[in-house]
Structure formats: C-alpha cells, structure tokens
Design a protein with these regions (language model features):
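Short, composition-biased motifs enriched in small/polar/acidic residues
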Residues: 319-386
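Short, threonine-centered small-residue motifs that mark membrane-proximal processing/anchoring sites
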Residues: 37-39, 343
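OB-fold nucleic-acid-binding modules
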Residues: 39-319
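Bacterial N-terminal signal peptides
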Residues: 18-34
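N-terminal compositionally biased, intrinsically disordered segments and leader/signal-like regions
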Residues: 3-5, 23, 42, 210, ...
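N-terminal secretory signal peptides that target proteins for export/translocation
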Residues: 1-19
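Compositionally biased, intrinsically disordered low-complexity segments enriched
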Residues: 8, 13, 26-27, 42-44, ...
Length: 386
C-alpha cells in the first residue's frame, strides 16, 4: 500500500507523514506477522523466577493495555542523532532513544507495568555492525511520529492516556521484559500504539517507604511471586515517603540518562536511587521529601534481575515541618443579612476623619468577618452604604 501526500511545512505535514508511515507499516505487518494478536497481561509478561529472570512463555504478537505514565519524551532524548558504525568505533552507541512506561489500568484483574523501548542506531550493536541496520535521521523521525501519535485520531500521546500496545517482539533485559523492536529496523518487528481513551487519568501512586522495598541491611527485598518487595511495584506509579538526598549530582533534567541518578536515604540505613526525568521538578530538596515517579529496574543484565531497582522521578514534595503560629488579631463581625456596610477606623475618637478598612471580608457562620492587626489606638465603626 502506498499513499502520496502533498508535503507541507508545519505540524500538519508531520501528521501526514505519520499517517503515511502507519499505513505502510500496517501493510508490512499484514504480510509478515503470523496470526492475530492475543491479549496479554502485565502480570504474566513480567513474571520471573528466583533469579529474577523472565518466565513468560506466551506467544507473539500480543496486545497489552494500560495507562501511559509519562510523556513520550520524558525519559530519553529522541532527537535524531545518527551515529555511524565506523568499523566498530561507535559500538553500543545507539544515538537517539525513545521509551515509555504504561501500567495496568484495572489492578483488580491485572498488576504491574511494562516499558516500551526503541533506539535509532541498532547497527552499532556488535551483533549487527552495519549502518544499513540503523535508522537514518529521516527514517527515525518517521518512527517517532508513528509512535507519538494515534494513527486514527492523530492525538498526541501524553501521560494519563489509556493506550493499547501491539507487540511483535519482546526482550528481557535489566530485570524486566520490555516491548522492543529486537534491535531490528525491519517493520515486521514494529510495535504499535493505539489510543483507547484520551485523558483517562494517571493512577493514584502507591504509597510506600524504603522499608517496603529494602531490608534493614539495605539489600533489595526480592520476591519472585511479586506479592511483596520491589517486584510488586515494578513498572507502576509510586510515592516513596520520608526521603532525604545524600547527593544532588544527578538532580538535573538536562543530564543524560546515566548522569541523572541521585541517592536518597530514609535515615535508617536504607538508600535508594532516584533517576531524574527530563522534566524540571524544581530544586533539590534540602530536607525530607516525598518522591513520586515510575518504579523501574536496571539490573544491567540479560540473565538475572534481583537488583538495580530505582525510581524515575517525576515529582518531589518537600515535607519540612511547619510551625503553627498563633496570631493576635482584631476580629470584627456583623450580620450578613440587612443593609450593606463598610468597616472604618480612626486613631482619635475626637476626630471626624475615618478611614475605610480594606482588608478582605469573609463569611463565617452567617457573619461578615474581617481581621485586622491588634492596636491599642485604633477604633472601629460600621458605616451603612445603602
């Protein structure tokens, strides 16, 4: 299938290009994909054994539904950045990258979340070793448009959308099973995203402390059943309470992925890594704070996954203790019903000069109420205005 569209500048042209690529890839998928995609669950896809290695035994292709937990450009920099193989000098240099996470919407019937990943320069992987196996900057741009917009409505995906992902490849790495292209630019390995409901709403974060995910000796709590510990929260939106930063080196939204790490503690010997997102979340807290974000795992291994848990930080809420102040104020009240009045004051009862009090008037228990600073030399009166 081929669609010819007039090339124009601006957002409309981007939409048209996205439509064209979607249609072309749809045709390729029809020709190359075997069978009909079946529905999968996050819980099944992320199941692991005692070593944290994937036990998923399902088949491809499959569909997976969930709430998008981030904007598509919130984790990785997807700006086109072709890096040539150069006889192996740029091995493992993937150039531009793209990643999202989405979480089960109905946690009564499913649990957990899944990451989707795509890189530009697969040709720089040692098992590929060829520029022909990487996306050019133009081809990469088309891929990003294909994934960032719903192919039917042209809705630009954002955090809080309910989406369905069709996967034709998945790989276990870093302690979790990811939906990927298998480091392959062949359209047969594409994953697709479709909109179910826009602005569905982010799930309420699961509230935890470090004692829920770390032992007293500061080791990770790993439970292969995923009923407790780190595995229970992987891929989900959580709120970790009562943290204090030990270092702020990685507290910078403009740093690269590997340089956005900070270490926090609960003050009881437990520590945890926070990975700053590409969004500004404000200055690094100097005291206790609560952290909201996506519970992630980066074990650095393709064969085990019992370590490397972290939080992709999306919000930091300072929890500095507030001091309760008792202020001495003059409280002036008069009935709401009846004629309209203004409050006036003077410092000399023998004077004919009165000044209107402009402080805000609020209604409390049927009484107009206004507060003023206490003063031994200030006198008040009501003056009828109608």
């Amino acid at each position: 299938m081929s669609v010819t569209l007039q090339s124009r500048s601006g957002q409309a042209a981007l939409f048209r290009r996205a439509c064209r690529i979607t249609l072309l890839n749809f045709a390729a998928v029809l020709a190359l994909a075997a069978g009909v995609a079946r529905a999968e669950t996050h819980a099944s896809l992320q199941a692991v054994d005692a070593n944290g290695f994937s036990t998923w035994s399902g088949s491809l292709p499959f569909t997976l539904t969930g709430v998008l937990l981030c904007d598509p450009d919130e984790m990785l920099d997807s700006t086109p950045n072709f890096i040539p193989w150069n006889s192996g000098a740029n091995v493992f240099q993937l150039g531009a990258e793209w990643q999202i996470a989405f979480q089960a919407a109905d946690t009564d019937s499913d649990w957990g979340g899944t990451f989707c990943y795509m890189g530009q320069c697969y040709g720089n992987m040692p098992f590929n070793g060829s520029d022909d196996l990487s996306y050019s900057n133009a081809a990469w741009t088309e891929e990003i448009l294909r994934l960032n917009y719903d192919p039917v409505t042209m809705h630009q995906f954002r955090a809080g959308d309910l989406i369905q992902v069709t996967a034709r490849q998945s790989d276990f790495y870093g302690g979790k099973r990811n939906i990927t292209e298998g480091h392959n630019i062949d359209p047969a390995y594409n994953f697709d995203i479709s909109l179910v409901t826009s602005n569905y709403g982010l799930p309420e974060p699961l509230v935890i402390t470090l004692s829920d995910i770390k032992n007293a000796d500061n080791t990770f709590i790993f439970d292969q059943t995923r009923a407790t510990g780190c595995e229970h929260y992987q891929g989900m939106r959580v709120r970790i309470n009562n943290l204090t930063l030990l270092a702020t080196n990685g507290w910078n939204a403009t740093n690269t992925w590997g340089n956005r790490l900070c270490t926090a503690t609960d003050g009881a010997g437990r520590t945890f890594s926070l990975r700053h997102s590409r969004r500004d979340v404000g200055p690094a807290p100097t005291g206790t704070f609560n952290a909201i974000g996506i519970f992630n795992q980066e074990s650095g291994s393709g064969v085990q996954g019992t370590n490397g848990y972290e939080l992709i930080l999306q919000s930091a809420i300072p929890q500095a203790a507030e001091t309760l102040a008792i202020a001495q104020k003059a409280v002036l009240t008069w009935p709401v019903s009846g004629a309209a009045h203004v409050v006036e004051y003077t410092t000399d009862l023998n004077s004919t000069n009165w000044t209107v009090l402009t402080n805000t008037v609020i209604v409390i228990d049927g009484q107009n109420t206004v507060l003023d600073s206490m003063s031994n030399s200030r006198f008040y009166r009501l003056r009828k205005t109608n």
